[in-house]
């Protein structure tokens, strides 16, 4: 049985649709269940539903053979997992944003984000010295209350930025969801995993 860790929310819904297009017989109530572990014996699969940042932890430690995670999470966490396939779902991008025309702190601008590793790497590569402030939610609030000069966050439509009077300043990276695998599981279950990859690859939406 292959165990697949999946994040709750939008990625989960799009991933389930992709699996169904690949002719995996997931029951109709699959997306409505409140269970965190769901067995699908007809397909010899088990699904673990988790927070996005936890998916890579489950895969890295081998409690899940495979996982579906956003490229943003993979960039931030840098875990010991293999990236098998770009699923081309949940498309968005990482960006730097801030108040239009706002003056930056000249010594070390403060940047609020839930992606401290990505932000640190990006600004270091840009030759900018910044102070990173880690937040877990409502990142857009930071410039509005004077906590930070800029933010680094995921942008999908840009609506949240606009509604809070912020503008996108720089684009860091494109983000889609990826199929990842535990290295040991890949060696032990390579045949089953490759069949899954082939079936998904055949139905992936093209960019």
Swiss-Prot record:
Domain of life: Bacteria
A cellular component annotation (GO) from this entry: cytoplasm
Main enzyme class: transferase
Cellular localisation: Cytoplasm
EC number: 2.4.2.17
MF terms (GO), sorted A to Z: ATP binding; ATP phosphoribosyltransferase activity
Any one Pfam family match given in the protein's UniProt record, by short name: HisG
Keywords: Amino-acid biosynthesis, ATP-binding, Cytoplasm, Glycosyltransferase, Histidine biosynthesis, Nucleotide-binding, Transferase
Any one GO biological process: L-histidine biosynthetic process
Catalytic activity: 1-(5-phospho-beta-D-ribosyl)-ATP + diphosphate = 5-phospho-alpha-D-ribose 1-diphosphate + ATP
Coiled coil: none
Pathway the protein contributes to: Amino-acid biosynthesis; L-histidine biosynthesis; L-histidine from 5-phospho-alpha-D-ribose 1-diphosphate: step 1/9
Main location (coarse class): cytoplasm
CDD domains per UniProt: PBP2_HisGs (cd13595)
InterPro entries: ATP_PRibTrfase_cat (IPR013820), ATP_PRibTrfase_CS (IPR018198), ATP_PRibTrfase_HisG (IPR001348), ATP_PRibTrfase_HisG_short (IPR024893)
Keyword Transmembrane: no
Annotated function: Catalyzes the condensation of ATP and 5-phosphoribose 1-diphosphate to form N'-(5'-phosphoribosyl)-ATP (PR-ATP). Has a crucial role in the pathway because the rate of histidine biosynthesis seems to be controlled primarily by regulation of HisG enzymatic activity.
Family per record: Belongs to the ATP phosphoribosyltransferase family. Short subfamily.
Quaternary context: Heteromultimer composed of HisG and HisZ subunits.
UniProt note: domains: Lacks the C-terminal regulatory region which is replaced by HisZ.
NCBIfam families named in the record: hisG
The name this protein goes by in its record: ATP phosphoribosyltransferase
Species assigned in the record: Geobacillus kaustophilus (strain HTA426)
């Amino acid at each position: 049985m292959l165990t697949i860790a999946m994040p709750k929310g939008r990625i989960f819904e799009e991933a389930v649709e992709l699996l169904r297009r690949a002719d995996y017989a997931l029951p109709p109530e699959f997306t409505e269940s409140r269970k965190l572990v769901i067995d699908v014996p007809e397909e010899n699969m088990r699904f673990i539903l988790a927070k996005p940042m936890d998916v890579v932890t489950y895969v890295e430690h081998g409690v899940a053979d495979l996982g579906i995670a956003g490229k943003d999470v993979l960039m931030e966490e840098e875990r010991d997992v293999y990236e098998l396939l770009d699923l081309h779902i949940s498309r968005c991008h990482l960006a730097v944003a801030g108040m239009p025309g706002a003056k930056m702190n000249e010594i070390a601008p403060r940047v609020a984000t839930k992606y401290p590793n990505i932000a640190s790497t990006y600004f270091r590569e840009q030759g900018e010295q910044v102070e990173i402030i880690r937040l877990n939610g409502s990142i857009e609030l930071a410039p509005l209350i004077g906590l930070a000069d800029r933010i680094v966050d995921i942008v999908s439509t840009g609506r949240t930025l606009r509604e809070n009077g912020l503008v996108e300043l720089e684009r860091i990276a494109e983000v889609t969801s990826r199929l990842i695998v535990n290295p040991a599981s890949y060696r032990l279950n390579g045949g089953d995993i490759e069949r899954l990859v082939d079936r998904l690859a055949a139905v992936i939406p093209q960019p």
